[in-house]
């Protein structure tokens, strides 16, 4: 264990971590070269990081090895965070350190002191097991605790972890979010951090979409929309706080054999398989309005319906076709705030022509029934993603 020093010699500011040393210790583990390398993270420059990739990059396992190294050398604990309390159940987290155990990293890091890990009531402890797997000795102190954003306010009065300095928020991007979930996450981080300046927040996800509440709140949405696999940069928020953002490119580390193996099983011309083969991110294809057929008559019913989401307006055109019947066409609205019509919003209405969610009443039900009946078209796949994300935030399904 290294000699403990504090930032500015002030214990309240937290332990002064030599991250270069920790990263050198990680390199000594000689992890496979084709998985994510956490030592490329600019940890001396930022306190927040967002790292996105497909499932095969080993992001979580790599940061959990950093977690073990921090505990060995500084007795620093880690908070492993998930969205909901259900996601933190032992049935879903007990295999979290399987890679560290099965590939011998626990013994590489701790030598003869410890050879295994066990989970007890959302706390991970180091231990020794005999040849039959029975725990014969265990550490009194936990090195990692499983936390949930959902229970943020409960932790305010019950959680005291002055040495918890690494927070790993796993699977941060999902299909559904709780109201004000980002605020709850920040509240949880504040409870853990207290007055420390040593805390690092690492956000990981196996889903890559710019339409996430978290990316929006972090000010990363516009960056994420333009980013492609392999991009990495430090982005400053409006208030000047730096955040590291990276989309890993799995292809850079895939060998010719791996690429060939993927194609031998998933060599189909379907873009939604891209994240499996590693050729690109998964792209959902949305229906685009077909070309008008000969003899078909299309009449616009209304252009006065809009969706407000991600600080943008989407126009919902309702058309009537002599061959297809009624349908909705979603397209960008290039102007500022629509002065007339109806605006559907996931925020508390602030204008006379704005309604929350999908609205109430027979008229609104008929409008959204077209969507439920798959009578919906989109000017682009990006437009489809935006509408999908808006409706998912309202828990509105077909």
How does the language model describe each region?
Residues 2-398:
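Phosphate/NTP-binding elements of NTP-utilizing enzymes
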């Amino acid at each position: 264990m290294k000699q403990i020093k504090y930032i500015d010699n002030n214990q309240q500011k937290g332990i002064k971590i030599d991250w270069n040393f920790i990263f050198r210790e990680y390199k000594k583990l000689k992890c496979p070269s084709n998985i994510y390398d956490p030592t490329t993270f600019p940890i001396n420059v930022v306190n927040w990081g967002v790292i996105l990739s497909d499932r095969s990059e080993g992001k979580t396992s790599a940061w959990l090895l950093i977690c073990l190294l921090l505990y060995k050398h500084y007795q620093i604990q880690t908070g492993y965070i998930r969205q909901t309390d259900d996601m933190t159940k032992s049935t879903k987290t007990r295999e979290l350190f399987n890679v560290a155990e099965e590939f011998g990293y626990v013994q590489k890091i701790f030598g003869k002191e410890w050879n295994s890990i066990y989970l007890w009531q959302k706390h991970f402890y180091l231990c020794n097991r005999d040849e039959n797997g029975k725990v014969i000795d265990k550490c009194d102190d936990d090195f990692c605790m499983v936390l949930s954003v959902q229970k943020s306010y409960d932790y305010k009065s019950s959680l005291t972890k002055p040495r918890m300095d690494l927070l790993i928020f796993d699977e941060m991007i999902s299909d559904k979010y709780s109201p004000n979930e980002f605020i709850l996450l920040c509240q949880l981080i504040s409870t853990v951090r207290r007055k420390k300046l040593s805390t690092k927040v690492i956000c990981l996800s196996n889903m890559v979409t710019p339409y996430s509440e978290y990316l929006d709140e972090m000010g990363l949405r516009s960056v994420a929309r333009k980013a492609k696999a392999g991009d990495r940069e430090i982005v400053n928020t409006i208030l000047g706080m730096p955040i590291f953002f990276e989309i890993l490119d799995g292809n850079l580390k895939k060998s010719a054999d791996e690429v060939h193996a993927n194609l031998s099983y998933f060599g189909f011309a379907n873009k939604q398989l891209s994240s499996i083969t590693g050729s690109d991110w998964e792209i959902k294809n949305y229906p685009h309005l077909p070309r008008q057929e000969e003899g078909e008559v299309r009449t616009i019913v209304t252009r006065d319906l809009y969706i407000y989401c991600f600080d943008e307006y989407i126009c919902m055109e309702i058309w009537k076709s002599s061959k297809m019947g009624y349908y909705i066409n979603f397209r960008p609205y290039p102007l500022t705030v629509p002065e007339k019509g109806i605006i559907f919003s996931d925020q508390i209405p602030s204008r006379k022509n704005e309604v929350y969610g999908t609205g109430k009443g027979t008229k609104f039900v008929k409008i959204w029934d077209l969507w439920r009946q798959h009578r919906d078209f989109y000017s682009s796949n990006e437009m489809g993603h935006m509408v999908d994300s808006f409706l998912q935030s309202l828990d509105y399904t077909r």
